[in-house]
């Protein structure tokens, strides 16, 4: 939790790119490694490609995301699912 008087943290290079695009009325994808940056209202409507450690995941920013971190929307781990064999064994066991 960050102090209220400090304000939200956002890397300066990300903020500069967003402000520049807002001034030009452009909507381009911004590639960033800054998962720690907080989403601010100026980012709404933009798409940021956030690095997950392997590749860039496109994140379209909506109003509901304001106040969250960019890294929350670019998952670093992929859930492959439980094995089908284990799921069928537990379903086939009779209840005691």
Curated annotation (Swiss-Prot):
Pfam families: Ribosomal_S19
Assigned keywords, A-Z: Ribonucleoprotein, Ribosomal protein, RNA-binding, rRNA-binding
UniProt GO MF annotations: rRNA binding; structural constituent of ribosome
Gene Ontology cellular component annotations, sorted alphabetically: cytoplasm; small ribosomal subunit
HAMAP family for this protein: Ribosomal_uS19
Family under the similarity heading: Belongs to the universal ribosomal protein uS19 family.
Function per UniProt: Protein S19 forms a complex with S13 that binds strongly to the 16S ribosomal RNA.
Protein name: Small ribosomal subunit protein uS19
Lineage summary: Bacteria, Pseudomonadati, Acidobacteriota, Terriglobia, Terriglobales
């Amino acid at each position: 939790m960050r102090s209220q008087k400090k304000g939200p943290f956002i890397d300066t290079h990300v903020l500069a790119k967003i402000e520049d695009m807002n001034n030009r009325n452009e909507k381009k994808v911004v590639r960033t490694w800054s998962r720690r940056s907080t989403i601010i209202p100026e980012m709404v409507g933009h798409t940021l490609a956030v690095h997950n450690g392997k590749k860039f995941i496109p994140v379209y920013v909506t109003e509901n995301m304001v106040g969250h971190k960019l890294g929350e929307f670019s998952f670093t781990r992929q859930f492959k699912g439980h094995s089908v064999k284990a799921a069928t064994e537990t379903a086939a066991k009779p209840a005691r």
